[in-house]
Amino acid sequence: MKNLAERSAGSLYWWLLATLFLPIAIPGLVLKLLTMMKEQRNARHLNGKVVLITGASSGLGEALAHSFFLAGCKVVLAARRKDELERVRKDLLELHATVPTHPPIILPLDLSDLNSIGGKVQSVLEIHGAIDILVNNGGISVRGDALSTAIDVDIRIMLVNYFGSVALTKACLPSMMARKEGRIVSISSVQGKFAIPHRSAYSASKHAMQAFCDSLRAEVAKDNIKVTLISPGYINTALSLNALTGTGASYGKMDAATAGGASPQDTASSILKAIARDEKDVMLAPIAPRAAYWLRHLAPSVYFWIMKKRAEKLNST
């Protein structure tokens, strides 16, 4: 009798547990299934799309080129260094020789030369007839406190990271609007969500891109154009090596945080998933940057104190 009572009590326990949690679990599972189905459908939809990627000669841009190429896209590789673009193009064709896809084309592009951008976009349209996805990935960083950073460096950072990407976006939009289809993907940074010491110009450029994308997203929704903003944390690329100092010289060093960052390949994979899910604003970062973001909004005094201590440490080195 005792064993029977225990079994009955156990059965009742699991029945109550199922009664309480199934109404919660089932909708969650259904939502996850629908999300996966949408992701797979949109991933298939990438096949044959024309994708223009800036900063495609190295780092995240190069990784994105591989990911889009493998998805069957017509990849347009854009950057200043034509020789590096040739290398990336060769790698795509050799490493993925068995993939039935489209040969990538090269577009030498200097984002700081605003007057040339319209013609560059037109040349792509003449070849492919459309630009389905623009990936604003090209950019530069800076290492230096605000006062010691020459105003020419501030201008250069904003010119490349913000005005160049904005000009390219505006050049691509008319053809997208005419077709009632397109997507703008802008690679920002967690530093576009919150600023840190010795990155004033870089953070400002990324904050500006955040605001531009938020405004643009609302304005072009009527034309079925999607805007996705990606805010990664540190990625293991040459960003710090290629960064400028406050005087405009080459920084030329690999930061420890950058060296320990996420792999470009993993980040590129996450970006394609975000596109497939039709996400609008995505933070790809570990817990510390996410905590800093929420701290900035929920406990700003604490955030400011932490940043002050960080600045003191940087100023003493």
Swiss-Prot record:
Cytoplasmic domain ranges by topology: 1-10
GO molecular function: oxidoreductase activity
Keywords linked to the UniProt accession: Membrane, NAD, NADP, Oxidoreductase, Peroxisome, Signal-anchor, Transmembrane, Transmembrane helix
CDD domains named in the record: 11beta-HSD1_like_SDR_c
Binding sites annotated in the UniProt record for NAD(+): 52-76
Gene3D superfamilies: NAD(P)-binding Rossmann-like Domain (3.40.50.720)
Annotated Gene Ontology cellular component terms: membrane; peroxisomal membrane
Membrane topology (Peroxisomal): 32-317
UniProt cross-references to NCBIfam families, sorted A to Z: PRK06181.1
Pfam families assigned: adh_short (PF00106)
The family this protein is said to belong to: Belongs to the short-chain dehydrogenases/reductases (SDR) family.
Protein localization: Peroxisome membrane
Enzyme category, top tier: oxidoreductase
Residue intervals passing through the bilayer: 11-31
Cross-referenced InterPro entries: NAD(P)-bd_dom_sf (IPR036291), Sc_DH/Rdtase_CS (IPR020904), SDR_fam (IPR002347)
Active site: Y202 (proton acceptor)
Keyword Lipoprotein applies: no
Claim: Oxidoreductase is one of the keywords in the record: yes
Name of the protein in question: Dehydrogenase/reductase SDR family protein 7-like
EC number: 1.1.-.-
Cysteines joined through disulfide linkages: none
Purpose: Putative oxidoreductase.
Membrane topology field: Single-pass type II membrane protein
Binding site for substrate: S189
